[in-house]
A protein has these predicted regions:
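Conserved ABC ATPase signature
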Residues: 139-143, 147
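The feature captures the beta-strand-to-loop junction immediately N-terminal to the Walker
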Residues: 43-45
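Helix-to-loop junction immediately C-terminal to a conserved catalytic motif
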Residues: 58
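Conserved catalytic motifs of ABC-family nucleotide-binding domains
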Residues: 160
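Short helical segment in ABC ATPase nucleotide-binding domains corresponding to the A-loop/adjacent helical element
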Residues: 101-109, 119, 123, 228
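ABC ATPase NBD coupling module
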Residues: 73-89, 98, 110, 115-119, ...
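Conserved ABC ATPase "signature" region
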Residues: 116-134, 187
Length: 261
């Protein structure tokens, strides 16, 4: 079972929207609440605004309407952040001239964290995602796709974020490696209990990882369903072979089909 909540971070959206220049509406009238320490997946078709939602939560975009609260900050149409946020993108986005450890250290450098503690924090983050001291000295081109994604995850975790945002991080990986990283992510979440928001278009992955699943319509994105996933943690790959798992996947898939109709 997960540990009890260790932080008060949460995310609350009230009628949030995003309209880009030219009038394209990416997200329309979205409302939801995510409590501290929850693991919530957001599923929907490509182009439905899932990534836009994450970027607004991260403060990389400003909503064009509604109220979005992230942590303790509240402002109409503006994202205010309280506490640390980690972001894992679909592409690892590693700096090619830096080693794995140097890439992981970048958020600490930008935060001007004390130099005397950086090395130990980087080593801890790399170890947490299953990378060795030898891996830490390699540049991205010397690492496999799965290892680069582990470095990206370690970089997001090194600041010990209260909120962890993941934008389809495993979408480009093969099924076996994807399952391995799903299990690694679950282990890390159970150990640290950040508020995790995981974007994916893979329903099976969402059911396997999340406590709740928010179903999003095709663009402009609206949330039509908030599905509670009943399975206890820790979850194991064998769960995917059960009838209960298949029924849960079927329920979410049916919601997606109805949302698209």
């Amino acid at each position: 079972m997960p540990q009890e909540n260790r932080n008060a971070a949460d995310v609350v959206a009230n009628h949030v929207g995003m309209t880009f220049a030219g009038g394209h509406v990416a997200v329309a009238d979205v409302s939801f609440a995510i409590g501290g320490g929850e693991f919530v997946a957001i599923v929907g078709p490509s182009g439905c605004g899932k990534s836009t939602l994450l970027r607004m939560i991260a403060g990389l975009m400003v909503p064009s309407g509604g109220v979005l609260r992230v942590g303790k900050g509240v402002a109409a149409g503006v994202t205010r952040r309280s506490g640390r946020i980690g972001f894992v993108f679909q592409d690892p986005r590693l700096l090619p001239w830096r080693t794995a450890s140097q890439n992981v250290a970048l958020p600490l450098e930008l935060d001007r964290s004390p130099k005397m503690t950086r090395s130990s924090r980087v080593a801890q983050a790399l170890s947490l995602v299953g990378l060795t001291e030898a891996d830490a000295t390699k540049t991205p081109r010397m690492l496999s796709g799965g290892m680069r994604m582990r470095v990206s995850l370690a970089r997001a975790l090194v600041t010990e974020p209260e909120i962890l945002l993941l934008d389809e991080p495993f979408g480009a990986l093969d099924d076996l490696l994807r399952q391995q990283l799903n299990d690694e992510l679950e282990r890390i979440w159970l150990a640290r209990r950040p508020t995790a928001i995981f974007v994916t278009h893979n329903v099976s992955e969402a059911v396997y990882l999340a406590q709740r699943i928010l179903v999003v319509t095709p663009s402009p994105g609206r949330i039509t369903n908030d599905v509670v996933v009943p399975f206890e943690y820790p979850r194991r790959p064998e769960l995917k072979g059960t009838g209960d798992f298949a029924r849960q996947v079927g329920e979410v898939s049916a919601h997606l089909r109805r949302a698209a109709s």
